[in-house]
Amino acid sequence: MTEFPDNTRWQLWIVAFGFFMQSLDTTIVNTALPSMAKSLGESPLHMHMVVVSYVLTVAVMLPASGWLADKIGVRNIFFAAIVLFTLGSLFCALSGTLNQLVLARVLQGVGGAMMVPVGRLTVMKIVPRAQYMAAMTFVALPGQIGPLLGPALGGVLVEYASWHWIFLINIPVGIVGAMATFMLMPNYTIETRRFDLPGFLLLAIGMAVLTLALDGSKSMGISPWTLAGLAAGGAAAILLYLFHAKKNSGALFSLRLFRTPTFSLGLLGSFAGRIGSGMLPFMTPVFLQIGLGFSPFHAGLMMIPMVLGSMGMKRIVVQIVNRFGYRRVLVATTLGLALVSLLFMSVALLGWYYLLPLVLLLQGMVNSARFSSMNTLTLKDLPDTLASSGNSLLSMIMQLSMSIGVTIAGMLLGMFGQQHIGIDSSATHHVFMYTWLCMAVIIALPAIIFARVPNDTQQNMVISRRKRSL
């Protein structure tokens, strides 16, 4: 057992607390969406922007978080992240309209974007390199508990209090965390290169405008010509960034990353793959409540097997990849996830509710194997000089693709659910059935990309749990 000095242990607890807050918030909201819709006078089929606004903001802000921490100091930025996250939570709870809630989620997302990467950077600075793995294991555990606790806790709060409490519980916790950060966390700074502000703005504008163009006609009533202009503007911003990065050695993300074939394939596959899988955590609790009439608490409990399956698969995924190779694992898990998603809908509509936890457990296992394989494939062949930049770009793409996935899911629900639908009605079942069929196709398509992954040339190392010190 690795022993840390008392002051270091307290600092690690602060980082772990930030990981927990951020991971809890990513899952606790989904269960509450139907109740939020009823309270705000909105259709539950149009509540996806509550999720998209948060995840997209995280994607936009991630590239700036590490630079800000180096320039201004890890304590100052981590403190600011907790304060912004807590203020965003307060404004979410006070929101009286969907637009107010979306804006509050943007503020919350700014704080959430800085918590995890700055937390990792803090750990690197406060512990010796030899203890880094043990320290990261220590701080990451609460982050794994958050997704497990979030759906059930969200269901309890919604059912026995109100949806406002899923945000209000962050306030006292955030105040304590901010005070502890300010008093106990050292403020490490280092000399940094100039921040690529033009590149950051081009990427931010491109991501935000393209996501808005996907859903603007349904949620905001934007005309088709305006949407076409937005899509063209977003694409132009991304193309301008590529031109900027080609001419600028200090660009936010170097184009030299794409000289590594597995990085290019892995990044493209991760983007396409997470669009499909990003729909599932949003759609599943909404379907359980609106489509099947489950209570918020019951729907939250049903999400736990999916998280347990995901956590359990992480223990054996390296051995599976070593045995079968990246290409076979990624193609099989991609097609398997599409089939399992269809199995979930079939079992639900047949009324075999007792099988749903087993199907969701299987879904979590398959999804986790695919996620872990995509991540390691993308980064494993990068040279050390580009590893940090590649990891940051992958993190941004992961968040962006999930926001696009939720946006597309909301767009599909709006397209198939034009008429008023009731809870657990035949019309509602048809809306979700057609949506799930489209989702299964979207989930399966990245198999075409993963089929191009080259044969593996080296084995992945398996860490022995008997020899690892914590």
UniProtKB/Swiss-Prot annotation:
Q: How does it sit in the membrane?
A: Multi-pass membrane protein
Q: InterPro entries recorded for this chain?
A: MFS, MFS_dom, MFS_trans_sf, Multi-R_MdtD
Pfam name, any one: MFS_1
Tell me which UniProt keywords the record has, alphabetically: Cell inner membrane, Cell membrane, Membrane, Transmembrane, Transmembrane helix, Transport
Topology Periplasmic: residue spans: 1-11, 70-76, 125-137, 186-196, 246-262, 307-341, 417-430
Write down the Gene3D superfamilies for this protein, in alphabetical order.
Answer: MFS general substrate transporter like domains, Multidrug resistance protein D
Protein location? Cell inner membrane
Transmembrane stretches in the record are 12-32, 49-69, 77-97, 102-124, 138-158, 165-185, 197-217, 225-245, 263-283, 286-306, 342-362, 396-416, 431-451
**Can you name one GO molecular function term for this protein?**
transmembrane transporter activity
Q: Which domain of life is it from?
A: Bacteria
Provide GO CC annotations from the record: plasma membrane
Q: Which residues lie on this side of the membrane: Cytoplasmic?
A: 33-48, 98-101, 159-164, 218-224, 284-285, 363-395, 452-470
User: Family per UniProt?
Assistant: Belongs to the major facilitator superfamily. TCR/Tet family.
What is the protein name for this chain?
Answer: Putative multidrug resistance protein MdtD
Originating organism: Salmonella typhi
